[in-house]
């Protein structure tokens, strides 16, 4: 917090100076500004996101203990990084403070509240984990359920009270000619208030360090002894361990520099190296505040899952604002329900679209069913009867019984098909009829399809007009004979002449 110029006023009764010594040169330069700006750009959004995630998790009652800890810690780090903006402004002006005394007091108060709240919070966390590790049976039963809430509230109240002196004593004073600096303490109150600041920060840090070492030693002894872990919340313990370890490593240099400064404050004027130690150890605290949310995300699986959920919902909301990204998906869903209806219509309309093509296709397929009963001279008339009485479902099944005969169709009849109907039957009906009609070739399922009245009735009505022109009288339904020919292809070929001649009489009808 203290710069090289701010750290030494009042140590030996010094007032504003007319000349600068070697110890008064400002140690911070342009690279300090770059480093601090990078920390702010990275740490402020990260801590804000962490506070929002922890707050939403605590609001829904999921992991309240961990959520309250992370919320308080994120707010403390956010405020500490926000206070660094005043430090960047001071560096840019070469140590000159252009904002006046009120802003100077607000800067030190904000720094004191954020620093003290984080220190007190992690000290309470370390003490809680130490008691849980040393007294695993007694402490969980005697710990109140609302203890995390009470601790977080008490930490912020205590940090505010501890920072009250920074609302009273700091002021913007002239240091050399027109150079104005922001001083935290001055003259007679320097020694007692500096001791309160240093000891008030060092003693909680010492308690944190001792409790953390005891907790880790107990955990190592438990792991080495192959004893079952008694800590119920492994995710919370992992997050607490990560945060406390980083805090001890990155904030220990600042505490040591403060102790050295207190030792020199008694009778010796602090040197240039000690001033630099105070400045750059303060940068380590800023680095810790910047890395804290990333360490929490790395140690907590629940926070990572919550962050993925938030990012996915945000991406979905962004995509909804751009409906053009979903345009390619619409044509894929529209043909789905219409393809089935189109196949059903084509299976019935196919004999009516172009009778000449249907007759030619049946003339090739029909002789394979009864080659001895039907001569080739009647190959034109016989399919007419089949197209009149045979249900539309049988017309499709009849073509699918012999898949090898499909390539034998007359190539000259293919162009005669109606161009509006034939592409639909080729592109839509042919792929979808196979999985639907192939199971109907079973000897049990085939009579059921022929005996159903609604389907033949619809087929007879659609083909009634061609039948009246090509046949001289009513003909019996030949459907009972068709399943037998399909089930037993060897035997019915000899008996088929006895069943077919009554229907071959009107063969001279269509030409």
Curated annotation (Swiss-Prot):
Residues 55-65, 127-148, 216-258, 304-511 are cytoplasmic. The keyword Transmembrane helix applies. It comes from the Eukaryota. Residues 1-20, 328-349, 361-386, 407-511 are annotated as: Disordered. Residues 335-345, 369-386, 435-453, 462-473 have a biased composition (Polar residues). Disulfide bonds join 104-182. InterPro entries: GPCR_Rhodpsn, GPCR_Rhodpsn_7TM, MRGPCRFAMILY. It is a multi-pass membrane protein. SUPFAM superfamilies: Family A G protein-coupled receptor-like. The chain crosses the membrane at residues 34-54, 66-86, 106-126, 149-169, 195-215, 259-279, 283-303. This is Probable G-protein coupled receptor 152. Orphan receptor. It is found in: Cell membrane. Belongs to the G-protein coupled receptor 1 family. Keywords: Cell membrane, Disulfide bond, G-protein coupled receptor, Membrane, Receptor, Transducer, Transmembrane, Transmembrane helix. Residues 419-433 have a biased composition (Low complexity). One of its GO terms (cellular component) is plasma membrane. Pfam families: 7tm_1. Its main location: membrane. GO terms for molecular function: G protein-coupled receptor activity; identical protein binding. Residues 1-33, 87-105, 170-194, 280-282 are extracellular.
């Amino acid at each position: 917090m203290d710069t090289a110029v701010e750290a030494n006023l009042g140590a030996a009764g010094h007032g504003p100076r007319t000349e600068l010594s070697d110890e008064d040169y400002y140690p911070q330069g342009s690279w300090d500004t770059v480093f601090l700006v990078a920390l702010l750009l990275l740490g402020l959004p990260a801590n804000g996101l962490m506070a929002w995630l922890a707050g939403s998790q605590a609001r829904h009652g999921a992991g309240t203990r961990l959520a309250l800890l992370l919320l308080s810690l994120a707010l403390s780090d956010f405020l500490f990084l926000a206070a660094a903006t005043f430090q960047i402004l001071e560096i840019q002006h070469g140590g000159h403070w252009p904002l006046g005394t009120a802003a100077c007091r607000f800067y030190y108060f904000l720094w004191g509240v954020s620093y003290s709240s984080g220190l007190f919070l992690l000290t309470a966390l370390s003490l809680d984990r130490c008691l849980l590790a040393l007294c695993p049976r007694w402490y969980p039963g005697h710990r109140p359920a609302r203890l995390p809430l009470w601790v977080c509230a008490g930490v912020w109240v205590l940090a505010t009270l501890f920072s009250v002196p920074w609302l009273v004593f700091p002021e913007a004073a002239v240091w050399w000619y027109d150079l104005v600096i922001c001083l935290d303490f001055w003259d007679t109150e320097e020694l007692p208030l500096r001791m309160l600041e240093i000891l008030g920060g060092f003693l909680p840090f010492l308690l944190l360090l001792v409790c953390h070492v005891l907790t880790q030693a107990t955990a190592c002894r438990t792991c080495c002894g192959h004893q079952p872990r008694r800590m119920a919340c492994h995710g919370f313990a992992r997050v607490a361990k990560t945060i406390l370890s980083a805090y001890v490593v990155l904030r220990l240099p600042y505490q040591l520099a403060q102790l050295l400064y207190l030792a020199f404050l008694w009778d010796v004027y602090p040197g240039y190296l000690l001033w630099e130690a105070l400045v750059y150890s303060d940068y380590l605290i800023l680095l810790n505040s910047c890395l804290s949310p990333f360490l929490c995300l790395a140690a907590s699986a629940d926070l990572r899952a919550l962050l993925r959920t938030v990012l996915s919902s945000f991406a979905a909301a962004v995509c909804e604002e751009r409906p053009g990204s979903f345009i390619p998906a619409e044509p894929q869903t529209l043909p789905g329900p219409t393809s089935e209806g189109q196949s059903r219509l084509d299976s019935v309309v196919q004999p009516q679209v172009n009778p000449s093509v249907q007759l030619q296709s049946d003339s090739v397929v029909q002789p394979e069913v009864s080659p001895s009963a039907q001569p080739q001279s009647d190959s034109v008339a016989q399919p007419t009867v089949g197209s009149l009485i045979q249900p539309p479902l049988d017309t499709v099944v009849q073509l699918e019984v012999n898949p090898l005969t499909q390539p034998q169709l007359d190539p000259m009849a293919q162009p005669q098909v109606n161009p509006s109907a034939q592409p639909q039957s080729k592109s839509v009906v042919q792929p979808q009829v196979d999985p639907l009609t192939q199971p109907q070739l079973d000897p049990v399922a085939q009579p059921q399809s022929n005996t159903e009245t609604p389907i033949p009735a619809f087929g007879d009505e659609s083909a009634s007009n061609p039948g009246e022109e090509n046949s001289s009288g009513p003909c019996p339904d030949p459907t009972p004979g068709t399943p037998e020919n399909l089930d037993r292809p060897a035997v019915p070929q000899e008996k088929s002449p006895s069943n077919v001649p009554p229907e071959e009489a009107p063969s001279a009808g269509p030409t």
